[in-house]
């Protein structure tokens, strides 16, 4: 029997499908629904990013090939001051103002306490609060994670939302292939 409300194949002037048609159709539909759900990048407006005791280190262009080393140095710096990292790594990208904006990249980590004596290159805020952000939640292969930022840029364009150019990417969880990432983009 066909599904309720379905049109018989013969009504379209073609031969009826094999006996298993409704079952195969349902399987394909369910698989497609799962693929769609797993590949969805959720977007929301007017979200607030709040980080406490956040330690930041600016990354120079010459250091981009050594990001793993920089993260290890940050963790060692935190531990050497009797503090502990709290939560995931955050990457912040800001653009300089002027006729030729240049990206500035920062690695950030929240720590369990303020560090009293900072070495050159490090900055710390007791509370970093960024209100009114566009937000995207990405789950999937990390080599596609840039799609979250791209989707927010498209969303901002379609909804006439002005962005400042500052974005925070929070690497919530990740293994060798897949991961979870939250992206906050600052709005004007």
Show the residue positions of the predicted features.
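Glycine-biased, low-complexity coil/linker segments
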Residues: 3-5
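A solvent-exposed interaction/effector surface
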Residues: 34-188
């Amino acid at each position: 029997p066909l599904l309720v409300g379905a049109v018989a194949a013969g009504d379209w002037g073609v031969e009826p499908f094999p006996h298993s048609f409704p079952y195969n159709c349902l399987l394909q539909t369910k698989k497609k629904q799962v693929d769609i759900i797993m590949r969805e990048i959720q977007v929301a407006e007017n979200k607030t990013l709040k980080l406490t005791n956040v330690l930041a280190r600016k990354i120079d262009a010459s250091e981009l090939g050594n990001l793993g080393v920089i993260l290890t140095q940050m963790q060692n710096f935190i531990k050497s001051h009797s503090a502990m990292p709290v939560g995931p790594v955050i990457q912040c990208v800001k653009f300089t103002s002027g006729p030729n904006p240049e990206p500035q990249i920062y690695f950030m980590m929240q720590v369990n306490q303020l560090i009293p004596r900072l070495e050159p290159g490090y900055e710390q805020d007791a509370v970093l609060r960024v209100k009114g952000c566009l937000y995207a939640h990405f789950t999937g292969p990390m080599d596609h994670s840039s799609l979250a930022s791209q989707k927010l840029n498209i969303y901002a364009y379609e909804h006439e939302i002005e962005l400042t150019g500052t974005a925070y990417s929070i690497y919530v969880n990740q293994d060798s292939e897949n991961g979870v990432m939250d992206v906050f983009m600052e709005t004007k």
